[in-house]
């Protein structure tokens, strides 16, 4: 019989069939043992989520994403790891509070600016309206943009030989 890496052998189909059959046997064995419950499409499935045994142990009694499906486990959670998880949860709550507070502050600031404009709005005299129109025209001409002249000595203007 030729070796596994021999040239004159239909390797691909044989190897793929063997691999697929062994995978299906393993999957059937896991299903019979009840290890594939719940299904991956189920909402209770942890498929695609980060697997963390310490978090599962920490949140075991709570109804949460980390709640463990099994009640009995052979793993324990050390006191040091439990304190670390509690500390990280506390930091996450503080970050959430901080972001909420800053978002609220920014929203309040926008409202305050609008209120100041409405409070400060007084009826303008004709002279003030003319002054404002003239200053707006001056600002528009001064902010017209960058004007590049076609002078000597610039890259755009051509060569410069001193």
Curated annotation (Swiss-Prot):
Residues 1-23 have a biased composition (Polar residues). Residues 1-50 are annotated as: Disordered. InterPro entries: Ribosome_bgen_Alb1 (IPR022784). Its main location: cytoplasm. GO terms for biological process: ribosomal large subunit biogenesis. Keywords: Cytoplasm, Nucleus, Ribosome biogenesis, Transport. It is found in: Cytoplasm; Nucleus. GO terms for cellular component: cytoplasm; nucleus. Component of the nucleoplasmic and cytoplasmic pre-60S ribosomal particles. Involved in proper assembly of pre-ribosomal particles during the biogenesis of the 60S ribosomal subunit. Accompanies the pre-60S particles to the cytoplasm. Belongs to the ALB1 family. This is Ribosome biogenesis protein ALB1. The lineage of its organism: Eukaryota, Fungi, Dikarya, Ascomycota, Saccharomycotina.
């Amino acid at each position: 019989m030729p070796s596994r890496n021999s040239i004159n052998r239909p390797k691909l189909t044989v190897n793929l069939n063997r691999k697929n059959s062994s995978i299906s046997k393993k999957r059937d064995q896991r299903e019979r043992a009840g290890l594939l419950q719940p299904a991956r499409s189920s909402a209770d499935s942890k498929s695609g989520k980060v697997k963390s045994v310490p978090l599962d142990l920490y949140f075991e009694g709570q109804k949460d994403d980390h709640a463990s499906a099994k009640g009995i486990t052979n793993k324990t959670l050390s006191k040091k790891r439990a304190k670390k998880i509690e500390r990280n949860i506390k930091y996450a709550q503080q970050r959430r509070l901080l972001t909420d507070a800053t978002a609220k502050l920014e929203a309040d600031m926008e409202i305050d600016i609008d209120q100041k404009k409405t409070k400060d709005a007084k009826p303008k005299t004709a002279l003030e309206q003319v002054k404002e129109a003239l200053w707006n025209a001056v600002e528009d001409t001064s902010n017209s943009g960058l004007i590049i002249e076609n002078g000597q000595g610039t890259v755009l203007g051509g060569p410069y030989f001193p």
